[in-house]
Amino acid sequence: MNGSGSQGAENTSQEGGSGGWQPEAVLVPLFFALIFLVGTVGNALVLAVLLRGGQAVSTTNLFILNLGVADLCFILCCVPFQATIYTLDDWVFGSLLCKAVHFLIFLTMHASSFTLAAVSLDRYLAIRYPLHSRELRTPRNALAAIGLIWGLALLFSGPYLSYYRQSQLANLTVCHPAWSAPRRRAMDLCTFVFSYLLPVLVLSLTYARTLRYLWRTVDPVTAGSGSQRAKRKVTRMIIIVAVLFCLCWMPHHALILCVWFGRFPLTRATYALRILSHLVSYANSCVNPIVYALVSKHFRKGFRKICAGLLRPAPRRASGRVSILAPGNHSGSMLEQESTDLTQVSEAAGPLVPPPALPNCTASSRTLDPAC
């Protein structure tokens, strides 16, 4: 984060220089370890559920998959290194990682915010123009949008490759900002505008219009249909994810603005506040799988299937009849049935109710023919 490369070590040494016990040296790594564990397992499960059987085929699924990739990259590539700031006085990972870690932090942050903005537009089109938007909301266009998202993220985070550097300071090896104060202030302001302020404005506008449309155009006939319930449910889930992103990253950006445009003295209280802002912003990368599990029953079922498959031994080879019937239990993706055109009705009427036998099935029909 901004200034986190060396200021953490400097503040730790300044505030804890009396030789007393430093609680942040123990408590902060524990919280980081919890974030790392929950985030790694949760996002890995999300990716496994969406990729299992090629289920990430809808636009919403692809965007959620991309969000999971960004969160997992942040957890694996950034959190372990940032945790050492509060436990070690020195930066021990070398000059290359000093630049790369901070670059990846802002790369994944931009990718997450742009993805949330894109999925908010996707939800608005799916709700407001369900028929006319089908030609636009295709997997191919979603992949193109994801490529554009990462391209923009690289563009806006690229300068951070030179923002930080490793150097010696008072017999310590530190990773600290290398730019002058005016350049850093301009860069931090641009980061706030493009990675937070503009995406939040897009999220607010699209979801406000989506909710307004949903509540003003409730049709008593179609409101209770499986398709409408599914679209409302997945929209609610994405709104929760977007709100959590805004809330989790708000303290970090507010703190940075206070440093540059207000008064932020280096005291024990402000140091604790900076640690808290880091923890809250980092925790955003592990809360999305929890939201999916709480809101989406399809994700819960997918999580249970993945966990059950990991815990139980490999099953024996199934017979031909079982192998044909098995795919029927996975006819829809975990989120696809909730997101666009597929509905929850297919789940209730498909896997649980066997299809009736056709009257013209004869002995010539093979036993493996699913129609018989």
UniProtKB/Swiss-Prot annotation:
Membrane association type: Multi-pass membrane protein
A GO cellular component entry from the record: plasma membrane
Location of region: Disordered: 353-372
S-S bonds: C98-C175
Pfam families in the record: 7tm_1 (PF00001)
Carbohydrate attachment residues: N2, N11
Keywords: Cell membrane, Disulfide bond, G-protein coupled receptor, Glycoprotein, Membrane, Receptor, Transducer, Transmembrane, Transmembrane helix
All ranges on the Cytoplasmic side of the membrane: 50-60, 122-141, 209-237, 282-372
GO biological process: adenylate cyclase-activating G protein-coupled receptor signaling pathway; adenylate cyclase-modulating G protein-coupled receptor signaling pathway; G protein-coupled receptor signaling pathway; galanin-activated signaling pathway; inositol phosphate metabolic process; neuron projection development; neuropeptide signaling pathway; phosphatidylinositol metabolic process
Transmembrane segment boundaries: 29-49, 61-81, 100-121, 142-162, 188-208, 238-258, 261-281
Location of this chain's protein in the cell: Cell membrane
Family according to the record: Belongs to the G-protein coupled receptor 1 family.
Protein's job: Receptor for the hormone galanin, GALP and spexin-1. The activity of this receptor is mediated by G proteins that activate the phospholipase C/protein kinase C pathway (via G(q)) and that inhibit adenylyl cyclase (via G(i)).
Protein name: Galanin receptor type 2
Native source organism of the sequence: Rattus norvegicus (Rat)
Gene: Galr2
